[in-house]
Amino acid sequence: MNLTSIDINILLADDDEDDCLFFKEALEELPISTKLTTVTDGNQLMQLLHKTEILPHVLFLDLNMPRKNGFECLSEIQISPSLRELPVIIFSTSFDKDSVNQLHDHGAHYYIRKPGEFAELKNVIHKALSTIEKNNFVKPTKDKFVLSL
């Protein structure tokens, strides 16, 4: 994936309408070309991933969603041979060290705590996309798992 030469296909799984809108607006202001698809619960996410022929370049995954939460989705992604290589960035308001460590151990690429300010959101999304590209989709060590500004 090259941030300047292709449309980056991003999938956002988040049940909060406002967060989805802010995410979309932040992407529109970044100097990169993206295509955003959103789903609002874990069941919808897994159905989409299992039926699509072309996976997104990256999944931003909220933890607290109805019907199937982000932890359950991440586990399901990691046990699926067709999905386990999908880069997953946890994108959540909740933050506790045990959960963060568990998410890293279960295959997530990065963890972003949802920022409260729009400018921070823009910057952290850009940082996440740039970092994942720079590292060629390789999962980071635990000390680099949490992305912040």
Task: Please give the residue ranges for each predicted region.
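Residue-level signal for the "D+5" position in two-component response regulator receiver
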Residues: T38, R67-K68
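Acidic, metal-coordinating helix/loop segments flanking the phosphotransfer/catalytic sites
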Residues: T38-V58
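Active-site residues of response regulator receiver
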Residues: L61-L63
